[in-house]
Amino acid sequence: MNCSRDTGDELMAALLAEGINLILPPRDNIAPGDLIIADPQGGARLGGWHEVFNLQLSPEVATDPGFKSFQFRASSILQVGVAASVMGRVLQALGLGSGSFSSAFSSSNADTIQLSIVAPANKELTNFDAVLVQMNEAKAEPAQGYTDRNFFVVTKVWRARGIRISVADKSKKQVDLSAKAVEELTAKAKMELKREDTGSYAFLAASQLIFGLTLREVTYKDGAIVDVAPTGPLKFRGKGPGDPFAFIGDDAFVDLPES
């Protein structure tokens, strides 16, 4: 199932506003300053500066444990079928399971579900412009075989502990999940489903996992490495002059193989 950014949902809109690419499959080996290499056929993989430009760079990273730039963490109130599909993809991105969750809610008189992110945090590359200067001072250019590729610098790594769901019936009253629903959700998520004191339920990982990346595109043009807006099939969103974000493809998820 593809998950378009343009869903009308508030959580997806917040991810869009932050320029977040949700990442598949989940892993814990991506850091701010890393490089993603995209080929003309639309594939993408994690690479390295030394591999492409024969340089060793020194990225500076700051941690924002308060996630202060991300103002909205809850989804719209979604119909069960829609929410179950989105939930499956989000859990997959967090490495907490996959598949359709629609049938799990049928035994609980569930009509709507609201999703939220648990314990979000990020790490940010703070010297992006200085990295570009360093590359150009070294007269860096792509090695043979990389001249037709697109390059994306990871400027932020977004992490979360899991997702929280709040379930309501047709009268908008919060309801508990049935034992059957808990059993099925636990099996599909491959982890414990915890009921919280508020009546919500949380899928929690043992530690914070990467669920998204913010990217900036760089290219080699006229003898220099420059930061540019993507073209062609790539999606571009800018918050203002000098602050562009790069999206890879129409899907909200970036399929980025381990190797």
UniProtKB/Swiss-Prot annotation:
GO biological process: defense response to virus
Disulphides: none
Keywords linked to the UniProt accession: Antiviral defense, Cell inner membrane, Cell membrane, Cytoplasm, Lipoprotein, Membrane, Palmitate, Transmembrane, Transmembrane beta strand
C-terminal region as annotated region, ranges: 244-259
Highest rank taxon of the organism: Bacteria
Stretches of the chain forming a coiled coil according to its record: none
Transmembrane segments: 70-86, 98-116, 162-179, 187-203
GO cellular component: cytoplasm; plasma membrane
PTM entry text: Palmitoylation helps stabilize the inactive state; may self palmitoylate. Palmitoylation plays a significant role in pore formation.
S-palmitoyl cysteine-type lipidated residues: 3
Free-text comment on this protein's domains from its UniProt entry: The N-terminus has marked structural similarity to the mammalian gasdermin N-terminal domain. The C-terminal region wraps around the twisted beta sheet core, probably stabilizing the inactive state. The beta-stranded transmembrane 'fingers' of the active protein form by local refolding of several alpha helices found only in the inactive state. Reorientation of the N-terminus probably flips the palmitoyl moiety for insertion into the membrane.
Family named by the database record: Belongs to the bacterial gasdermin family.
Protein name: Gasdermin bGSDM
